């Protein structure tokens, strides 16, 4: 990968990405007795229509691509992504990876195979396709919690690194606003170039030194939870502005981590989640950043140039 990118509707070149939101979820369903991760018939069509509404909303702001890092254990549905892409004209990049790392990796280890089996699964989904859909993943998702990286999380990182080195696929991470530097080191020591890594949910931390350590290590920092009610957007924007003022625009990407259809979960755009919608960065956050001195050139760097360079495999400027 690098010369081309797998998407839900085929392959494209990095130059075709355009404006990109780096972390949004079209559909999420946690596993369990009520899970219905593969909706069909009228339900599939209704869900696709709702999700397409959000997709059309971001299209009005010039967004061309969405990275959807939903994993199989969060209800990943490649066919739904392809349908939403067809209805909206969006390019949607889906992921391979695991979210519920502790339980999954523990079971894998007990059944035999461990890191080898998981890396083989990732490679298969990146090169052959997901299940029988023939839709290939375009990025690898990994997860760590806090306060330390546990053994199962380390094994997931190593499996992802092995798949990344074998295929050239980039990696996007989940953090709780900590351990991004540790993720960077484990992946890097396993052979993944740091500029092929996005450290996700970095906006959960207000620590400029933490962010600076990541960007100085040549990975990208994602401010990708704008609109979530756990922290005011003004706080996230202030932290992002510090990094822009320090000259790090070329290391930053933005998004919302929004869920367009969450089965048995909250509905975005209402109540406490009224701002947790994929248009929020354009409608509310850009004006905040402009007031702080951010420029249109910096917005395009974060939204267009950095995703293009990241997927192309280029080194940050």
What are these regions (language model features)?
Residues 72, 200-205, 224-243:
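Active-site glycine- and acidic-residue-rich loops that bind
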Residues 81, 150-155, 178-191, 207-215:
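Distinct, well-ordered alpha-helical segments
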Residues 83-86, 91-166, 220, 225-230:
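Active-site gating/metal-coordination segments in enzymes
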Residues 18-91, 116-135:
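Alpha-helical scaffold segments that flank or form the walls of functional sites
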Residues 2-10, 278-317:
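Mid-to-C-terminal alpha-helical segments outside catalytic/metal-binding sites
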Residues 89-90, 167-168, 188-196, 213-222, ...:
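Glycine-enriched alpha-helix->loop->beta-strand junction motifs that scaffold or abut catalytic
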Residues 174, 224-225, 248-272:
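Short acidic/histidine-rich active-site segments
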Residues 23, 66, 98, 164, ...:
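Divalent metal-coordination and catalytic microenvironments
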């Amino acid at each position: 990968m690098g010369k081309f990118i797998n998407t839900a509707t085929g392959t494209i070149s990095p130059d075709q990405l355009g404006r990109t939101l780096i972390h949004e979820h079209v559909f999420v369903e946690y596993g369990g007795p009520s899970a219905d991760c593969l909706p069909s018939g009228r339900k599939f069509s209704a869900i696709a229509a709702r999700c397409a509404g959000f997709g059309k909303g971001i299209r009005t702001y010039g967004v061309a691509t969405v990275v959807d890092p939903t994993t199989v254990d969060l209800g990943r549905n490649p066919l739904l992504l392809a349908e939403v892409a067809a209805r909206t004209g969006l390019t949607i990049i889906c992921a391979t990876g695991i979210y519920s790392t502790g339980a999954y990796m523990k079971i894998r280890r007990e059944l035999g195979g461990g890191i080898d089996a998981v890396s083989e699964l990732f490679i298969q989904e990146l090169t052959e396709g997901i299940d029988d859909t023939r839709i290939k993943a375009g990025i690898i998702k990994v997860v760590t919690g806090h306060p330390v990286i546990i053994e199962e999380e380390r094994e997931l990182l190593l499996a992802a690194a092995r798949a990344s080195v074998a295929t050239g696929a980039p990696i996007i991470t989940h953090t709780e606003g900590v351990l991004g530097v540790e993720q960077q080191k484990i992946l890097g020591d396993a052979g993944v170039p740091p500029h092929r890594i996005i450290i996700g949910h970095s906006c959960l931390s207000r620590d400029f030194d933490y962010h600076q350590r990541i960007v100085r290590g040549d990975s990208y920092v994602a401010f990708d939870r704008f609109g979530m009610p756990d922290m005011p957007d003004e706080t996230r924007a202030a932290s992002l502005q510090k990094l822009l003022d320090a000259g790090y625009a070329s290391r930053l990407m933005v998004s919302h981590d929004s869920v367009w259809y969450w089965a048995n979960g909250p509905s975005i755009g209402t109540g406490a989640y009224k701002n947790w919608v994929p248009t929020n960065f354009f409608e509310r956050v850009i004006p905040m950043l402009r007031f702080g001195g951010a420029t249109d050139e910096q917005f395009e760097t974060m939204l267009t140039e950095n995703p293009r360079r990241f997927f192309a495999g280029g080194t940050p400027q």
